[in-house]
């Protein structure tokens, strides 16, 4: 895929940068792998906002993605590469030789007609899924399980990848996109290669309206609010807020670490950079 720019026929087009999706399927999603998706507007079951700046946006259907890749040693053919509104990566529709169809995250370099398989001792090629113990050192991987059989949980965003660094007994060391080096059990599964749609990060929406189409509401600065709404609100003219940057609830922000210690910290060999 390539990047597309536009002539400045309007202020919104002037800075817009989008991705050419010539290789994506023109048809709709596979109906058997689609379910409804209701919007929350950022509210919980009490109707209170628990996640700000969420609301509106185009109606979506959820595509059921196979993160477990538990259909072992059965060849599948890539039938289509499709757009998925629920994630940054594109998805690939697989058709297995027994007739079943499943969606997976589309890896970089995989195209329509390619063969993909999951198993314990399959070839090391993009899209194939196998246990970390059977993947050679230095291999680029994505879609990694954190618990055996639970399904992939990390390295799933567009263009991301991790690298297998070492093997120590029952564990392997993997360097994640954040720079963190972490232990995973050797039987946890991962997919070979990098997640596709690398150009996603180069996009520029060009106007506020396109952000609203994605279900994002305005992110208002605290210093632009009144004192009743934010600790940094109020003041005469354009004041600086009068204190160190903080959240609406008074917690320091812009670099202040809020992560609590947890039992899984023992698997972190090197903290993220």
Curated annotation (Swiss-Prot):
Keyword annotations: Ribonucleoprotein, Ribosomal protein, RNA-binding, rRNA-binding
Basic and acidic residues: bias regions: 262-273
Region (Disordered) location: 222-273
Record-level Gene Ontology MF annotations: rRNA binding; structural constituent of ribosome; transferase activity
Regions that span the bilayer: none
Pfam families: Ribosomal_L2, Ribosomal_L2_C
Cellular component aspect of the GO annotation: large ribosomal subunit
Source organism, top-level taxon: Bacteria
Keyword tRNA-binding: no
Cited InterPro entries: NA-bd_OB-fold (IPR012340), Rib_uL2_dom2 (IPR014722), Ribosomal_uL2 (IPR002171), Ribosomal_uL2_bac/org-type (IPR005880), Ribosomal_uL2_C (IPR022669), Ribosomal_uL2_CS (IPR022671), Ribosomal_uL2_dom3 (IPR014726), Ribosomal_uL2_RNA-bd_dom (IPR022666)
ATP-binding found in the keyword field: no
GO biological process: cytoplasmic translation
Role this protein plays: One of the primary rRNA binding proteins. Required for association of the 30S and 50S subunits to form the 70S ribosome, for tRNA binding and peptide bond formation. It has been suggested to have peptidyltransferase activity; this is somewhat controversial. Makes several contacts with the 16S rRNA in the 70S ribosome.
NCBIfam families cross-referenced by the UniProt entry: rplB_bact
Subunit structure: Part of the 50S ribosomal subunit. Forms a bridge to the 30S subunit in the 70S ribosome.
Family statement: Belongs to the universal ribosomal protein uL2 family.
Descriptive protein name: Large ribosomal subunit protein uL2
């Amino acid at each position: 895929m390539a990047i597309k720019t536009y002539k400045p026929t309007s202020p919104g087009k002037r800075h817009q940068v989008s991705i050419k999706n010539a290789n994506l399927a023109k048809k709709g999603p596979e109906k058997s792998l689609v379910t409804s998706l209701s919007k929350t507007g950022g509210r919980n079951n009490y109707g209170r906002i628990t996640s700000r700046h969420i609301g509106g946006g185009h109606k979506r259907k959820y595509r059921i993605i196979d993160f477990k890749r538990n259909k072992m040693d059965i060849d599948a053919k890539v039938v289509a590469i499709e757009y998925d509104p629920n994630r940054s990566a594109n998805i690939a529709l697989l058709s297995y030789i027994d007739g079943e169809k499943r969606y997976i995250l589309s890896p970089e370099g995989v195209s329509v007609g390619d063969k993909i398989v999951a198993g314990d001792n399959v070839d090391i090629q993009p899209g194939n899924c196998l246990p970390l113990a059977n993947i050679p050192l230095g291999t680029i991987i994505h879609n990694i399980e954190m618990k055996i059989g639970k399904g992939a949980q990390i390295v799933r965003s567009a263009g991301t990848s991790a690298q297998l660094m070492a093997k120590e007994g029952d564990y392997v060391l993997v360097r994640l996109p954040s720079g963190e080096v972490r232990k995973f059990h050797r039987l946890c599964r991962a997919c070979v290669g990098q997640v596709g749609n690398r150009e996603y990060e180069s996009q520029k929406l060009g106007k506020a309206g396109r952000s609203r189409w994605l279900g994002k509401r305005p992110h208002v600065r605290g210093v632009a609010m009144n004192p009743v709404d934010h600790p940094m609100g109020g003041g005469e003219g354009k004041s600086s807020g009068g204190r160190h940057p903080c959240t609406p609830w008074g917690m320091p922000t812009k670099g202040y670490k809020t992560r609590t210690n947890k039992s899984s910290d023992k698997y972190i060999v090197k903290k993220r950079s």
